[in-house]
Amino acid sequence: MSEAILQVTNLVKKIKGKTILDHISFEVGQGDCLALIGPNGAGKTTLMSCILGDKKASSGQVLIKGKKGKAQDQIAVLLQENTIPSQLRVKELIAFFQDISENGLSKEEIQALLQFKDDQYQQFADKLSGGQKRLLAFVLCLIGKPDILFLDEPTAGMDTTTRQRFWEIINDLKKSGVTILYSSHYIEEVEHTADRILVLHQGKLIRDTTPHAMRSEEKEKQVTLPSRFAPSLDKLADIYDVTEKRDVVTFMTKDIESVWSSLQAQGCRISDIDNENFLGLSGNCLLLR
C-alpha cells in the first residue's frame, strides 16, 4: 500500500453504554478507493462521523495526513442525506460554490461532470429528480478540487443511468490520485470500483479484503431471506439444506454469485434495503432481513 493518508487506530464509540464502534483499526493509502459495507446499524455512518470529527470517539485515534483533525481545504464530504438549498437555482448553487473555492473547477468542467441539459441549470434545485439532486450534491463537493473524498451512501436515490455517470466520475478521480472512502449497499459497485473492502458488522471490523480476494473465495455460504422469497427458491439449482422458520427461509450454497444473480432477477433487490431489510456480510454468511 502507498503512504497512509488516513490512519484509524483502536477507534471506539459508545453511546449510553452501548458500543457502536468496537476497536476499529485500518489505514488508507494515498489514491486508494476503499469501500465500507455492512447492514444498516453496523456503524458505517458513525465511523465516518468519528473520522471527520463530527462525532467524538470514546477512545482511539484518527490521523489524516499524519495529523489529528481534518484539513478542511483538502477534504470533501457527501452526506447520506441531501442538503442542497432548495430555493436556489442550479446555476446559482454552482456559482456560489465557485465563489467560495479558491482555484476551483471551471464552469465548463462542472458542466462536463453533470451532463445536465441547458434548462436544468435554470431550475430550482428542488425541481430536480432525486438522482439528479444527488449527482449535483456530489459535483458541488468536487468544485474545490479535494484530494480526499468521504461519501456516505453516495448512490442512494440514483437511477441506473445517473449511477453509471457517478461511477464514471469516480473512476476518473481514482486515475487522478484522489483518495476515496465510501459506504455502499451495492455489492456489484463495490466489486468493480473499490481497491479494498471493509466489512462492518455490529460495530466490529470483521473483514479487510479486496474485490479479487472476495470473488475468488470458494466458501460454502449460508443465505437467510425473508419468507416471502421462499417460492423463488424452487428455481434455484445450486442450493441445499433449505429450512423455513417463522418469517425467514435459510439455505446453503457454494455458488453465491450465481444464486444472488438469480434472486435479483426474481425481484430480490439490494436497493430495497431499509432498517428492517438489509444486506449483511459476515464471514461465510449472507443475510437479508
Language-model features: locations:
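Hydrophobic anchor residue at the start of the ABC signature
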Residues: 138
